Amino acid sequence: MVKFESSGDPGFLSAVDGIANIAKATLDSQGRQPSHDGSDSEASAVVTFSGKQENLLSGLRRFDTVFLIDDSDSMAGRKWALVRAILQRATTIAARYDDDGIDIQFLNDENHNRSHITSSTLVMQTLASITPNGSTPLGAQLQKHLRAYLIYFDEQERKRPNSARQRNIIVLTDGVPDERQSMIKRTIVKAAKKLDKNDAVDEQLGIQFCVIGNEPGVAEFYSSLDNDLEQGEDLERDVSTHRI
């Protein structure tokens, strides 16, 4: 996770991790071979939580969840089936705890971006209509989304202080982005400094990277990004990455 926080709000972090760990649980589950129609056998698995976890996940009402999805050509096949399973689970959970649902955004096929989804059927229909193709412009898309969020944050603060909804961006990808690591680092640090300057609450924004598959060099890329973010930046909030 890229954590924009100082003290760490357990409720916020647990709610954030609850959604993100749906991805991890899907990837770790057994018997998840895709069927002949391209669906995933685990897509309809029931997700349950303890009473304590239920209370923590109620914190989802405090923020918007955005899945930024790598739809490059390398995501075709089994990886895309896993994306379907992850998002079906996530939609079910989000709808249970937050009437706003989730947003799904794509690196390449922006015509299929959807907002406030509470129906897993709509998620499946959207993903079924996409053929993964193209490169991995993660840096450019992350920059675009962070810039749009900061504009929204400023507008809300002018209307009423502390009224901007918190946001959690979960990136589903299988590889190293097209852009240099330094560009992604600058994008993240710039957003963190903007939040510092505007006295945003500690847990205003989070970014998590969920890596699907074991492509060479990917783990090293995000580990190095994490190390770079922890060093040499004069920030009032902690900034680090977490690779699921």
Give the residues covered by each predicted segment.
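Acidic, low-complexity intrinsically disordered regions
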Residues: 1-244
